[in-house]
Swiss-Prot record:
Keyword Ion transport applies: no
Family assignment from sequence similarity: Belongs to the eukaryotic ribosomal protein eS4 family.
Biological processes annotated in GO: translation
Keyword rRNA-binding part of the UniProt annotation: yes
GO cellular component assignments: cytosolic small ribosomal subunit
Domain (S4 RNA-binding): residue spans on this chain: 37-100
Native organism: Methanospirillum hungatei JF-1 (strain ATCC 27890 / DSM 864 / NBRC 100397 / JF-1)
Name this protein carries in UniProt: Small ribosomal subunit protein eS4
Any Pfam family matching the protein: Ribosomal_S4e
Keywords assigned by UniProt, alphabetized: Ribonucleoprotein, Ribosomal protein, RNA-binding, rRNA-binding
GO molecular function: rRNA binding; structural constituent of ribosome
Length: 241
């Protein structure tokens, strides 16, 4: 059972029934972290696009599921927050987000919204030629000549001929809008009030104001993903309050 795990111990973020079949597909190493949702689990358990692994493999062979502009080939490939999933045959598009219970949720979006994706910069490295490589939260990276900071979010084009070009930028700074993707405030959209560096190995703290309730709350910078500047880009990104 190297490629499977027991449903009862599957990540809660998957949001799947735990008392049906005994085993479920394990996510292969790749994009996102260990809580990434295998595409077959998304297609079968969440969306009902396929009924079993056999159907899932057929759909993938026919290149009928596209993630972030690329056809998915392996049923155990993981998808995660802010990924764009398209089904060309039906013309449907979705953005993967997290709700307030930390579960993956699938938000229908239109074709225009599906033409780009948002990613968080985790760190940067200098590569050959002096160019800057932005290392992104989902495990991918992109080269640039411009200056961006760790913690910022960038928007990458998924259009043919422009794929992975940076078309927008949301800085990690007070006054800008962020979505929380972990902890007890998961799914909340708020405005950053203050970023508090913490010495040593402890995570830095961030204080935000909940745009829905008006209340202030605190989280750690690892859970913060920028989603707008002075005004929230909530409608554009399909983020639910």
């Amino acid at each position: 059972m190297g490629h499977h795990l027991k449903r009862v111990v599957s990540p809660k973020s998957w949001g799947i029934p735990r008392k049906t079949d005994k085993f479920v597909t394990k996510t292969s190493p790749g994009p996102h972290n260990k809580n990434a949702l295998p595409i077959v689990v998304w297609a079968r358990d969440q969306m009902g696009i396929v009924r079993n692994m056999k159907e899932a493999k057929h759909v993938l062979r026919e290149r009928e599921i596209i993630v972030n502009g690329r056809p998915v080939r392996h049923p155990d490939m993981g998808i995660g927050i802010f990924d764009i999933v398209s089904i060309p045959k039906s013309g449907k598009h979705y953005r993967i987000l997290r709700d307030k219970k930390g579960r993956h949720v699938t938000i229908p979006i239109d074709e225009d919204a599906a033409s780009s994706r948002l990613v968080k910069i985790t760190n940067k490295t200098i590569v050959k030629g002096g160019r800057i490589q932005l290392n992104l939260r989902d495990g991918s990276n992109v080269l640039t000549d411009k200056q961006y900071k760790s913690g910022d979010s960038i928007v990458l084009s998924l259009k043919e001929g422009q794929k992975n070009e940076i078309i927008d930028h949301f800085p990690f700074q007070p006054g800008n809008m962020a979505m929380i993707i972990g902890g007890k405030h998961s799914g909340v959209v708020g405005r950053i009030i203050e970023h508090i560096p913490v010495p040593g190995s402890l995570p830095n703290r961030v204080i935000l104001k909940d745009e829905s309730s008006g209340e202030s709350f605190e989280t750690i910078d690892e859970y913060v993903v920028m989603v707008g500047r002075e005004s929230p880009a909530i409608d554009r990104w399909g983020i639910e309050e």
